[in-house]
Amino acid sequence: MSQLITIERHILEQQKNFPEATGELTDLLSDVAFAAKLVRREVVRAGLVDILGFAGSTNVQGEEVKKLDLFANDKIINAIGQHGRFAIMGSEENEGIIIPPKNETGSYALLFDPLDGSSNIDVNVSVGTIFSIYRIKSSDPGNASISDCLQKGSEQVAAGYVIYGSSVVMVYTTGHGVHGFTYDPTIGEFLLSHENITTPGSGKYYSINEGSYAQFNDGTKRYLDYIKEEDPATGRPYSTRYIGSLVADFHRNLLTGGVFVYPPTTKHPSGKLRLMYEANPLAFICEQAGGRATDGHRRILDIDPSELHQRTPLYIGSMADVKVAEEFEQGIR
């Protein structure tokens, strides 16, 4: 690009299109970008310092916690929570809500997965941070409660993710398109690299953990058989691309087209992915880029949450590909 545009400048430029904007979202997203820089610094050094491996505890999901998970969680809470812009926060790693300092001046709720795919960090596979921002409903921020977090995904005012891979990329939306920024370590800034991202209407890749095939329902099994069949007219067979890091799989499919499927299984009949920390923010981004995201029956952003750590199946990606997967899940095909 002929002109270097930082994420802060880009957000400010976008803000000019909305005279009623207060600038709060600019500050919020700048805080997230700063926290991402801190996490990135440790991710790239993870093999050199003692933050690999397990911490010897389990999180609220019943999963063994990685040391880097805890580090990322603490860094994000401390870096973002100290400025008084958030009244309440929720993390995949914390059982309950988090009340940050100076919360009485905050107007927003932050929900986040500090380090998605962290089980892969030991083998140098991409990991990421996923975040979601809501405006609180409480009239008194000092008394913000879990109900301020339990909002439908359609109520999000911003969402995004940071992927830590061969390069570090931050992607976000405020409901007016999707934009991506690549981190330049020589100047310490996220620079605009993917403006107005639109996902292809269909793709040629599918992402699913086929190791769970025996636990899939008949609809999912028939869907997998279908996309593996030879049919040039419909672009089949599709090719499998599955990293095992949600944010990395989603990012690839967002740019190249395709579908990510995490269906219900006999082990996890309500799905395994977290609605508030993973499905909602990625669904917001996907829809803004022209894609589709459902639980196989309902639009993800229309689900009314009842729990902070609620789980859901997820079908997300290119519009046409998600619709086909849904039809098999619903028994239409």
Curated annotation (Swiss-Prot):
Binds 2 magnesium ions per subunit. Keywords: Calvin cycle, Carbohydrate metabolism, Cytoplasm, Hydrolase, Magnesium, Metal-binding. GO terms for cellular component: cytosol. Belongs to the FBPase class 1 family. Mg(2+) 2 binds at residues 113, 116, 278. This is Fructose-1,6-bisphosphatase class 1. InterPro entries: FBPase_C_dom, FBPase_class-1, FBPase_N, FBPtase. Mg(2+) 1 binds at residues 92, 113, 115. The keyword Metal-binding applies. Its cofactor is Mg(2+). Pfam families: FBPase, FBPase_C. Gene3D superfamilies: 3.40.190.80, Fructose-1,6-Bisphosphatase, subunit A, domain 1. Its EC number is 3.1.3.11. GO terms for molecular function: fructose 1,6-bisphosphate 1-phosphatase activity; magnesium ion binding. Homotetramer. It comes from Chlorobium luteolum (strain DSM 273 / BCRC 81028 / 2530). It is found in: Cytoplasm. Its main location: cytoplasm.
